[in-house]
Amino acid sequence: MTKNDPAAYTPPLGHAALTPIYDAAIALLTRENAWRRALVAEILAGGHDAILDIGSGTGSLAVLLYQASPHAAYVGVDPDQDAVRLARNKAAHSGSAATFVVGYFPAAIPSEPIDVIVSSLVLHQVSLAEKERILAAALDRLKPGGRLILADYGLQDTALARFLFRATVQSLDGRANTQPNADGVLPSLLEKAGFSAIEQRAKWRTMTGVIYMYIAAKPLASAI
C-alpha cells in the first residue's frame, strides 16, 4: 500500500479490481473484528491525542476508533485513491471527522510530532527496503515516548499457517515482499530502526495465516 513509486504500490487485495470486495474479504478471512478492536483498545489505552494510520485503506480502523472515542484526532494516509474514496464515504456515513490523505508516508503528512502511529496489513505488501524506510520514518515522526502499533502477518509458525499464507496472501501479493514477514522479520526491523520496548502483544490464527500485534516506542532519549 505504501511504496515510493506511485505506479508500484500494491492495492489492498493485490489487484485494483478487488478493492471493492476488500472489506468483505478481510472480515471473512482474517478475524478482523478481533484484531482491529485490539488495535483500538491499545491506541486508547495510551490516551493519545494525535493518531496517524499508515496505509489506512478503506477506513475500517477510523470508524471503529470513532465509535470508541469520538473525539480522537485521526489522520489516515494511503496512496490508493479508490481505497481513500471508500474510506471517506465510510467515515462520513458513520459521522466520523477522520481525515484521509491520498499520498505516501511521510511526504504527504505535516511534520508535527505524532503521539501514536498505527499500521495494519501494510508492511507485508512492500519490499524489505520499504519496510525499513517506513519504520525509520515512523520513528522520526513520533514524539519521544510515542508508540508504534502494528498489526500484520508475522512468523508463520506451523505447517498449516505456512500453507494458508501461501494459498491466500502470497497468491495475491506475491512472495518477494511477503516472505520476510512470514519468516518473522518484523521484531528485528523494529530494533534496527531504533525502537525500544518492542513487544509482541497478541497473535491471531486466521484462514490466511498468523497475524500479530507488535508495540514499540520511540526512546525518550530521542528528545536530546
PLM features: residue spans?
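A short glycine-rich, Lys/Arg-flanked "PGG" loop and its adjoining helix->strand segment in the class I
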Residues: 132-144
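Nucleotide donor/acceptor-binding cores
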Residues: 48-49
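Conserved class I S-adenosyl-L-methionine
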Residues: 1-45
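Class I SAM-dependent methyltransferase SAM/SAH-binding core
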Residues: 52, 58-106
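C-terminal alpha-helical "lid/dimerization" subdomain adjacent to the S-adenosyl-L-methionine
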Residues: 6, 151-193, 198-206, 212
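C-terminal lobe and adjacent flexible extensions of AdoMet/dcAdoMet transferase-like proteins
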Residues: 213-224
